[in-house]
From Swiss-Prot:
The gene is argS. A motif ('HIGH' region) lies at residues 131-141. Its EC number is 6.1.1.19. The keyword DNA-binding does not apply. It comes from Helicobacter hepaticus (strain ATCC 51449 / 3B1). CDD domains: ArgRS_core (cd00671). Monomer. SUPFAM superfamilies: Anticodon-binding domain of a subclass of class I aminoacyl-tRNA synthetases (SSF47323), Arginyl-tRNA synthetase (ArgRS), N-terminal 'additional' domain (SSF55190), Nucleotidylyl transferase (SSF52374). Keywords: Aminoacyl-tRNA synthetase, ATP-binding, Cytoplasm, Ligase, Nucleotide-binding, Protein biosynthesis. GO terms for biological process: arginyl-tRNA aminoacylation. This is Arginine--tRNA ligase.
Amino acid sequence: MHHHIKALLQSALNIKNTIDIVLERPKNKDLGHFATPLALSLAKIEKTNPKLIAEEIAKILTNYAEFEKVETLNGFVNLTLSTTFLQHIAQKQLQHCMTLEADSINPNISQYTQKTQITPKEHILIEFVSANPTGPLHIGHARGAVYGDALTRVGRFLGYDILTEYYINDAGAQIYMLGLSIFLAGREHILKTQVEYPQSYYKGEYIIDLAKQCALHFGEDVFKSEDSISSLADFGKDMMLQEIKDNLAQVGIKFDSFVSEKSLYDRWQDTLDTLKSHQGIYTKDGKIWIASSQINDEKDRVVVRENGEPTYLAGDIIYHQDKFHRHFEHYINIWGADHHGYIARVKAAIHFLGYDENKLEVLLSQMVSLLKGGQPYKMSKRAGNFILMKDVIEDIGADALRFIFLSKKPDTHLEFDVDELKKEDGSNPIYYINYANARIHTLFNKAGVNMQQTAQNANKLDINEQAKALLFEALCLQQIIESSFRNREIQKICDYLKSLSASFHSFYNTHKILQSPNESSILYVLMIVSQSLTLGLSLLGIKAKTRM
């Protein structure tokens, strides 16, 4: 709809491609569906009175069937779309992105993408979660996980070629510490030997569980010698990675690729040589440093210690060299907010590797504060000082978790009470949206609607003004989707779904629908509303409910 109107304005008014045509939604709905400040922009270029230009634009556009009314106000041109045009857009939307069966509406996202993709879009690599395989996923990981997955779903819907990737941090001190923690837990709980734990060891019942699994796999003698720590670390890492994959599957997340840090380390010398060839590293005090302060970092960083061991940063440098060597057009990393200071040093490394660091976009995900009945959510005994993603899914369900985590910008702090998401009223957004869709399908069932037949006869229907307003709102989803991906603001889809649901509930409560003179036209409009609710939820990774 937005693209059609913009293209019409450009063609009808002979506007150059260099001029941006803006369509705004007026706060006062009486002013029309859209307002454009195009006359103000043209007036600056032509040094002319914007009111005169606006009047000339209105005079031209009045002749087009897309508009029921065209008016001017303070240099703006206000556009009220015709019912015929809205019905035309609705028909296209039904055909492109939904499969209509006699009694149901199903998303057909791949078909939509094929039909609407005009030009090839970017090949993008999105890396997210990438939690160390040293423990279970907590709710901080969960927020970045559902955000990365939803961003991928929306991007693919719009025709972007996206590959999702999980970087496995399976090298370095944290993996050794996992093995040591399992070893000591085995000695204490299986061999019943008194042990002294280091300050930075991994805590929680999951470590004891891993020790018991290691005893079954290797035998109890594995805890008698420190020589087994490496084997215990590898076994524990593999077990935790599988648990992470299982946890992600619970919320519908599956990665296209997993890349092991350990598998990349045989390239470290080649990576150092490349950095050196671009004057990116130097030796000082027995260490090798990357000159990241030259590329917007606050200081240079150590990449190799005095003992010859690479630092944590070295692993990320090798990984990003591997990423950029695969020649994607754009790279998106979704990191925890505590990694904010890491962005500049990684971008500096990309620069010194000979790649364009501006192709890397880093999005940050803030932590989550959870309440239950107004009190802090109980920490997991299994994980120690964390709230596990798995526990919250069991408490409120995957759909509620996905929606609430996507309902705010990821770089803002999120606090919510899980008990609110169990309520069956308007205070629970996912219930409110699903209830709207279920109400619509109840109407379809009572009326015995054949959706295919209703869609085919749409042009014969007489839609009144109230239903037309609801139809217009239901047709705004495409623009919301495009904006949400362009600005990386998936919460816009959540806001739209809540708003559309509220508009439907208001319409439902104030209008007689079944056995009314306008029954057929209203049910057709509600078909479009249901389509938008179903598709919007699908892009968030949530299956819309048709009965509750």
